[in-house]
């Protein structure tokens, strides 16, 4: 529940500071899990703020995230990762601290 709450808060924050000219890309695990995120808070938040949310499936790990950062072509805004990947990603400077 805490993980979902943080993801929801992050999504709300990102959506609130962007304009309607931008879309937010949320990366999650796919299937019923992602569908529940979309229906539960993704679609309602996007509709309320008038900002499109693009959903992308991924299989986990940090390799795709590292590749985007190293190439200077970051296309993912919010990523649903395991706690262990969060710790490693923060330690390696892959993720930015989000103080809320």
Predicted regions and their residues:
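Bacterial N-terminal signal peptides that target proteins for export
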Residues: 1-8
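Short secondary-structure boundary micro-motifs
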Residues: 8-9, 71
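A general structural signal for well-ordered secondary-structure junctions
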Residues: 14, 71-74, 95
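Sec/Tat signal peptide C-region and signal peptidase I cleavage site
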Residues: 18-23
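Early extracytoplasmic/lumenal segment of secretory-pathway proteins
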Residues: 24-88
């Amino acid at each position: 529940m805490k993980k979902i709450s943080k993801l929801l808060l992050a999504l709300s924050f990102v959506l609130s500071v962007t304009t309607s000219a931008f879309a937010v890309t949320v990366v999650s695990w796919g299937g019923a899990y992602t569908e529940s995120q979309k229906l539960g808070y993704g679609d309602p938040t996007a509709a309320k703020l008038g900002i499109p949310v693009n959903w992308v499936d991924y299989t986990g790990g940090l390799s795709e995230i590292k590749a985007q950062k190293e190439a200077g072509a970051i296309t993912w805004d919010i990523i649903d990762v395991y706690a262990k990947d969060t710790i490693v990603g923060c330690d390696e400077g892959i993720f930015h601290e989000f103080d809320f």
